[in-house]
Amino acid sequence: MYQKSLLFSLLATSALAQFPIPDSKGSVTFDAPYEVAAGKTYDGGYKTYGRGVSCSGQGEGGQDDAVFLIQEGGTLKNAIIGSDQIEGVYCLGACTIENVWWEAVCEDALSLKGGSGPYNIIGGGAQGADDKVIQHNSGGQVNIDGFTVYDFGKLYRSCGNCDEQHARTVTIRNVVANSGKTLVGINSNLGDTASIDSSTCATDVKKICVEYKGNNSGDEPEEVSEGPSDACQYSEPLSSC
């Protein structure tokens, strides 16, 4: 009886740790980034989209390496980004990313590159990010709601050393985070703020909110503090997932 109970316990633990990516409905390989026009919506039908290339690791790619380019006000929804790509999805202006899943993150999953937001990430998820999942280079507000992230470096990072810096704001709700280094990284000296709602849970995440001293010189930004503050707005501890 004990062995049977132990087996059920192990199976339950394994199930909880399983990244809940939807089943793929097919695959599409683009020769070049697919552009979602301003104000338009692309419904991926839960197919897996890639570029037919191997991940180049943490070497900085560029716009030409993305799978999707989303123009101002565009929406990408119901899509799976495959492992055969480098730069994932770029938002070149305010965008909505809804129920988009990353099979495996290469350099970054989602890069916010232009405009002033808002950038809305609703549902979906990503796994296997050595560093960042969401990289925020432009200014404005990011809203992350209902996202699932497993095995990651940082869920969200406000650019720490971009040539042109901005005050950035991120709000996180209903996020499920499992096995990561840092949930959020912001530059408090540049006016960034992060708000993490108690609906977010974190299991085996080493740091919840880290403040950096951002710069525009290209130097590696200095980590100055972690934990709740005027800039990192949340209550400890977050619940386990």
From Swiss-Prot:
Presence of the UniProt keyword Signal in the record: yes
Primary localization: secreted
Co-factor: note: Binds 1 Ca(2+) ion per subunit.
GO biological process terms, semicolon-separated: cell wall organization; pectin catabolic process
UniProt entry keywords in alphabetical sequence: Calcium, Carbohydrate metabolism, Cell wall biogenesis/degradation, Glycoprotein, Lyase, Polysaccharide degradation, Secreted, Signal
Gene Ontology annotations for the cellular component aspect, listed alphabetically: extracellular region
Catalytic reaction list: Eliminative cleavage of (1->4)-alpha-D-galacturonan to give oligosaccharides with 4-deoxy-alpha-D-galact-4-enuronosyl groups at their non-reducing ends
Residues bearing carbohydrate: 215
Family: Belongs to the polysaccharide lyase 3 family.
Full protein name: Probable pectate lyase D
